[in-house]
Amino acid sequence: MARSTIVLRGLRREYPSGEATVVALRDLDLTIEPGEMVAVMGASGSGKSTLMNILGCLDRPSSGSYQIAGRETASLDADELAALRREHFGFIFQRYHLLPELSALSNVEIPAIYAGQSRDERRDRANGLLARLGITDRASHRPNQLSGGQQQRVSIARALMNGADVILADEPTGALDRRSGDEVLRILDELHADGKTVIIVTHDASVAARAKRVIELSDGVVIADRATSTVSPAVAAPTAAAAQAQPRSRWPWQSRLDRIGEAFRMAMLAMAAHRLRTFLTMLGIIIGIASVVFIVAVGDAAKRKVLADISSLGTNTIEIFPGKDLGDVRSSKIKTLVVADARALRLQPYIDGVTPTVSTSSTLRHGPLEANALVNGVGDQYFAVKGTKLSAGRFFDADGLRDVSQDVVIDEKTRQTFFSDDPDGPIGKVLLVGRVPCRIIGVTQQQQGGFGSSQNLSVYLPYTTVQARFLGNSSLRSILVKVNDEVTTKAAELDVTRFLTLRHRVKDFVILNTDDIRKTITNTTETLTLMIAAIAVISLVVGGIGVMNIMLVSVSERVGEIGVRMAVGARRSDILQQFLIEAVMVCLIGGGLGVAVAYGLAATFNALVPMFQLGLSAGSIIAAFICSTGIGVVFGYLPARQASFLDPLAALSRD
């Protein structure tokens, strides 16, 4: 490390005080050579503390020149001044200024973290310094577990951590008893003997007498500058300890990772120190994240349920009805939609299945029981087109259509109505449909509520049977068409429209496209989900504002800590990073708890409503964590920036 000659020329420091100006230092000229031990004396208000703050780059002169190791400090920015404090100066404060959350060892290590030393390097050096100062057995103790003398020794070890060549001691014995004070002065004598430049600010003449040179101030002016001994100043040569302090060459990212690790550690300590406040801060994030994740899960489940219900109408299907359009009051009088149309459509290459449908209502009877039901006349491909499954028996086939058979397939509701107490089941039994006796050959599985389901009883007969035995005409209620997977239902709809218009010579039919219904309802579901999620996002924003508020409080509470870190060499970016990471950690942990709450809500909902199952997608969870991190960055930046722009001297003064 380059030896630091301190040169002050015409240095002046003024402070505004209302409408007046207070002059703390007046046109000071001073030179301190490397290796000197200097005492700066003066009464309260003489300017000695102001001089020490300027010498340690904690404050700037109003005018004049201050050079350290040949560098003019007036031209340096905040980070360059931090580098000077980190590399050239070691501070010993009257009030110690140790961080209460950290052990003695960790307090000593702080300057080395900002200097880029590796964890092993700084741990070894810190232990060595504590051993040299006789408090190695207190390395794991926190400041409140140490005596005043022990705390001051930790402060001295911290000042020596980076091998500083200038030690600035502000009333180092002022808060100590006589015995502890003598030990501290002995240590300062040893540092001077090692070649350090030692500058002691004191009002005690007996302390000043230990120095080789005494500078007296009064009203900001040097009134005396005298040597107390004829002994020559120590030769300013780098000592082994100083050489050891130089960090070995490391990649920049390694130093950056160390500083980030320190920031994470301090964030966790700060959060643990105020558990209730931290939890209440997280609560807004927890509620917001849980709401968003849960609502997205509900929206996805609703969409799946709707799509499953629409699938009950048949996937990739279109249905053709008589009439100019849906709801045409004259549709019942249009008799042009016939079985021949269905047979012609079946020959088209883009058609996978076609079934004519007719329907009527009738009374079902079995033994003493009777009930009204919907009688559906369908083709043999109907069940495949609709995706209907059996719980028992079989479907009728093309032979049943041709033979106008009286084989009937009943639904689950019909089975429960007429055969719930029959141990043999309904298969093979005779069911009277109106006046037509029918043999039950199959039972369909029960459909959940939704599209394609009905509270009415339903039975299925060949459409030929219904036309001949119930309706007495050949016209159809509709033709249900399943389109090949290679063809879109929209394209098939256009082709079917052209085909039937040519056959009928007029467009006297309307086509219902289930995919259009699917898209409409899906879009509606997504819109509703988005609207509800937007409301939930508001709670996230409120939570983010809470994070900002608490971080501002945290900054105001930890001004002293910020000042200490800046005094030992922390850059503005280090302070910004520390408080930003703390805000992000609060939001990330809140986000994790929010996801856990959403899981709990989903599990409870699934247990209470088994027919409507919620599932949390990985995408929504990842989005939740990204969102919570973003909230931490956005709402934590302002408090973190405020912390990083604090004046180090003002921060130390407010501790």
UniProtKB/Swiss-Prot annotation:
Stretches that traverse the bilayer: 279-299, 528-548, 579-599, 618-638
Gene: macB
Classification of source organism: Bacteria, Pseudomonadati, Pseudomonadota, Alphaproteobacteria, Hyphomicrobiales
Listed Gene3D superfamilies: P-loop containing nucleotide triphosphate hydrolases (3.40.50.300)
Organism: Rhodopseudomonas palustris (strain BisB18)
Primary subcellular site in the record, as a coarse category: membrane
Biological processes per GO annotation: response to antibiotic
The protein, known as: Macrolide export ATP-binding/permease protein MacB
Main EC class the enzyme belongs to: translocase
Topology versus the membrane: Multi-pass membrane protein
